[in-house]
Regions:
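A surface-exposed partner-binding patch
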Residues: 1-47, 107, 114, 125-134, ...
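Short, solvent-exposed loop/turn segments at secondary-structure junctions
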Residues: 33-36, 48-49, 60-64, 80, ...
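Compact, glycine/acidic-enriched structural inserts
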Residues: 51-88
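A structural "flexibility-hinge" signal
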Residues: 54-57, 100, 111
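Inter-repeat boundary and helix-capping residues of tandem alpha-helical solenoids
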Residues: 86, 93-94, 127
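Alpha-helical tetratricopeptide repeat
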Residues: 94-108, 135
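Low-complexity, intrinsically disordered
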Residues: 111-114, 118-119
Length: 274
């Protein structure tokens, strides 16, 4: 994993998380920590280990991490502005994923669909594991009749990072209702779309888990490794929040899973020399 040039300016944990929560690729640092499990960390997307990370905030009570700064430089700018504390003063962060999303939303309010698509695409390029930006992009592709890119975006909206944001019911509905285009008719997610509702918890049996397992297994087989690892982590995250009896019935042990996933992601979570 590529470390930022100014890495010496933060007090860094030396071990990258394996998952489930915090997710794989999250590296905790101590500046601006609020305690009680709320702190910041560097985060590398799956497939972007050779790029500098963004900065995410771990929000313990919600069980998520949230993209907060587009780079460590931007975090440090904010941190210094707030007298080296967690303060209320804000900075401009043009490359943050939410900034592009908001610009896209503004364009939609002005009925400028093509410009909105540009900003939504920029948001996915800025950070590609957020369900919302892919769904915003998908919706506009649908609006202009671009079915191929609509379906590609829906796939990315579902196989996003659920430790950051869980796909909305609108995403699931769009997935289930689509008729796959020829180029995507054999995609593992689209082939299994009718069997997924992504409802978890409070059930004695839940077929979603077996379907998801089938999907990420096939993604591994066809060489889409980054999406496979992301979806496998999502599977484990949902299973992690289930009751212990549910886990036992489904032969899931978080420690066993972490051990195996650590091996799968070993090359990914190896840091460049500090």
């Amino acid at each position: 994993m590529k470390l930022p040039n100014n890495i010496a300016e933060i007090s860094l944990d030396k071990e990258v998380q394996v998952g489930v929560y915090p997710p794989n690729g999250f590296l905790h640092f101590y500046e601006a920590s609020l305690g009680n499990g709320d702190y910041f960390g560097l985060y590398w997307e799956f497939g972007k280990e050779d790029k500098e990370p963004i900065v995410c905030e771990m929000i313990h009570d919600e069980g998520i991490i949230k993209p907060s700064f587009s780079s460590l430089d931007k975090f440090l700018e904010w941190y210094k502005l707030n007298n080296f504390d967690y303060g209320d003063e804000e900075i401009e962060d043009e490359k943050l994923v939410y900034n592009y999303l908001e610009k896209g939303n503004q364009c939609l309010r002005q009925n400028n669909v093509n410009k909105a698509i540009e900003f939504y695409k920029m948001s996915t390029e800025s950070f590609g594991e957020l369900s919302e930006n892919w769904f915003k992009l998908a919706s506009q592709y649908k609006r202009i009749g671009n079915e191929l890119d609509f379906q590609k975006s829906i796939i990315n909206s579902v196989i996003s990072n659920w430790a950051i944001e869980f796909p909305s019911q609108n995403v699931i509905r769009s997935l289930k209702n689509c008729t796959p285009v020829k180029e995507l008719e054999n995609h593992p997610l689209l082939k299994n779309r009718k069997n997924l509702d992504l409802n978890f918890g409070g059930q004695k049996e839940n077929e979603n888990y077996e379907v998801i397992k089938d999907i990420f297994t096939e993604l591994y087989e066809i060489g889409d490794t980054n999406k496979a690892m992301l979806l496998e982590q999502n599977y484990a995250l949902m299973m992690y929040w289930e009751t212990s009896s549910f886990q036992e019935r489904n032969n899931f042990n978080i420690n066993d899973w972490r051990s195996k996933f650590a091996q799968k992601t070993k090359s990914r979570i190896t840091l460049n020399k500090l």
